[in-house]
Amino acid sequence: MADVPKREVENVEFVFEVMGSPGEGIDAVDLGDALRALNLNPTLALIEKLGGTKKRNEKKIKLDEFLPIYSQVKKEKEQGCYEDFIECLKLYDKEENGTMLLAELQHALLALGESLDDEQVETLFADCMDPEDDEGFIPYSQFVQRLMSDPVVFD
């Protein structure tokens, strides 16, 4: 706890109040969501490595167990930031005007990296996407801003 500033500990405690049960901690299946609520972007592999589970009620993570995890993820270099995502999406911006085809974004989310499933992509688009224009293009910077500012919850 020594390497986590007091203000950040307060933020972590708040996330635990919202996501967990008093004294019991948070469900390990919610580890990634808790970290993302604290403005971190861990990969699914890292979440699993740090004790995240895929099924609810397998394990609980208490606050004193979570703080070292939070500290470790905060130091991770493999997190994407806004600029990283924009640079990646610029590869699809053939006109260099801040837009890309919605179909290309959908394909990238379904097939590349830590891919999402169809339902997750639909939820993501419903929560973060501007409507496409008549030619099928969307402004990708607003999409990334919304994506990074408001966590999208997948059931």
From Swiss-Prot:
SUPFAM superfamilies per UniProt: EF-hand (SSF47473)
Source organism superkingdom: Eukaryota
Domain EF-hand: 7-41, 80-115
Subunit annotation: Myosin is a hexamer of 2 heavy chains and 4 light chains.
Protein name (record): Myosin light chain alkali
InterPro entries in the cross-refs: CALM/Myosin/TropC-like, EF-hand-dom_pair, EF_hand_dom
Gene Ontology process terms (BP): mesoderm development; muscle contraction; regulation of catalytic activity
Entries under Pfam families matching the protein: EF-hand_7
GO cellular component: cytosol; muscle myosin complex
Transmembrane segment boundaries: none
Single Gene Ontology MF annotation: enzyme regulator activity
Tissue note: Indirect flight muscle isoform is found only in the indirect flight muscles. The larval and adult isoform is present in the larval and adult musculature.
Gene3D superfamilies in UniProt: EF-hand
Keyword list, A-Z: Motor protein, Muscle protein, Myosin, Repeat
